[in-house]
Amino acid sequence: MTLSRLLLCTDLDRTLIPNGPQPESPQARGYLESLVSRPEVTLVFVSGRDRALVEQAMATYQLPCPDFVIGDVGTSIYRVGPKHEWSPLDSWQRQIAVDWDGKSATDLQIMLNDIEALRPQESSKQNRFKLSFYVPVEQDTGSLSSIIHQRLESAGVRVRLVWSVDEVEHTGLLDVLPLRASKLHAIEALMEQQGFDLDNTVFCGDSGNDMEVLISPVPAVLVANGHEDIRCRVIKLARQAGTEKQLYIASGEFLNMNGNYGAGMLEGIAHYYPDTLAWFTQPTDASNRIVP
């Protein structure tokens, strides 16, 4: 079956953005630019970054303008487009608001104020549906998770807790989100809203933060620069979930590239959707039609 449209969802740091220690294949950027300029392709950035940091990355790395941005760890979806509109998708906000029973991040912070291990992050890192804290890196996250869940669930609030570590600052990080707010659920909501399905969607990522999508039924690509432990984990979890056929591990050598960053994205996209190979390797005219 000929592919008529593609929803291309990609993580930013160390996936689309070549900001890891591994080398980038120089020809990958040109191929990617050709691919995302096609009218058949809807480009979606999927990131933990907020709007300001996404815009900063777009300027710093000269990224193509996306059609949509899923940001703030899945709590926001923006329609962007060539006019850089940055219009929030209100339908997504309404979906995730149900989990917090009409409450905001400010309300939740008041409910958690007496927990000494939680230090609120700067206001620029918060939004209505994302409450972020600094946590001691040695903190027992299991017991703290139980306390937070018990406290909030008794108030009718259902949350997802996302733990990570800032290795530079040597501090723990915690994002308190609505239960259904995640990269995967946001992608699924956008698929439904835009009329895409599993036969014309792909996700590209590199790290543990992408794990939920990488092992889901959504066709997914792990770029070659992903850490070995991530590669082992994602293969194991995909096998357990029965989604091995929906996972592609980039290995390099595709079009004489190394599989890192954009090269890995292209390798995986062409694996799932061979029609796209012509989209980014054959020259096009100004109307984005293939030149004979």
Residue positions per predicted region:
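Mg2+-dependent phosphoryl-transfer enzymes with acidic/Ser/Thr/Gly-rich catalytic loops
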Residues: 3, 177, 184-292
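Active-site flanking residues adjacent to catalytic metal/cofactor-binding acidic residues
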Residues: 10, 71, 205
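Asp-based phosphoryl-transfer active-site loop
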Residues: 3-21, 214
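Short, flexible loop segments at the rims of nucleotide/cofactor-binding pockets, characterized by
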Residues: 19-23, 46-48, 179
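Conserved acidic, metal-coordinating active-site core of Asp-based
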Residues: 109-202, 207-217
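Active-site phosphate-binding/coordination module
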Residues: 26-123
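A short acidic/small-residue loop/turn micro-motif
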Residues: 23-26, 225
